Amino acid sequence: MELTPREKDKLLLFTAGLVAERRLAKGLKLNYPESVALISCAIMEGAREGKTVAQLMSEGRAVLTAEQVMEGIPEMIKDIQVECTFPDGTKLVSIHDPIV
């Protein structure tokens, strides 16, 4: 199977998101990379499902709460930007202060 560098990046991000999902299900608090991966995956999946950029920007702020991540993580993640493929092309989805 041949994958482009972009496809490899998406696959790696998705895998990290799955790890984060499992750790969260076990009741563990997520660290920085896990938090970013989980939020990014939720955004990419939403785009795949046909949601709008505005919907994803709103939903991206509801993926995690401060109680679900390690201390200091909400302050470290000020913005997350994810390039997603929509039916009408590729767009950049930005989420400001994603963990509240």
UniProtKB/Swiss-Prot annotation:
- Compartments reported by the entry: Cytoplasm
Q: Which E.C. number(s) belong to this protein?
A: 3.5.1.5
Q: Which SUPFAM superfamilies match?
A: Urease, gamma-subunit (SSF54111)
Q: GO CC annotation: what is one?
A: cytoplasm
Extract the InterPro entries matched here. Answer: Urease_gamma, Urease_gamma/gamma-beta_su, Urease_gamma_sf, Urease_subunit
The answer to keyword Hydrolase applying to this record is yes
Pathway membership, UniProt: Nitrogen metabolism; urea degradation; CO(2) and NH(3) from urea (urease route): step 1/1
Q: Which organism is it from?
A: Proteus hauseri
Q: What is its main location?
A: cytoplasm
The entry assigns this protein to a family as follows: Belongs to the urease gamma subunit family.
Full protein name: Urease subunit gamma
Transmembrane residue ranges: none
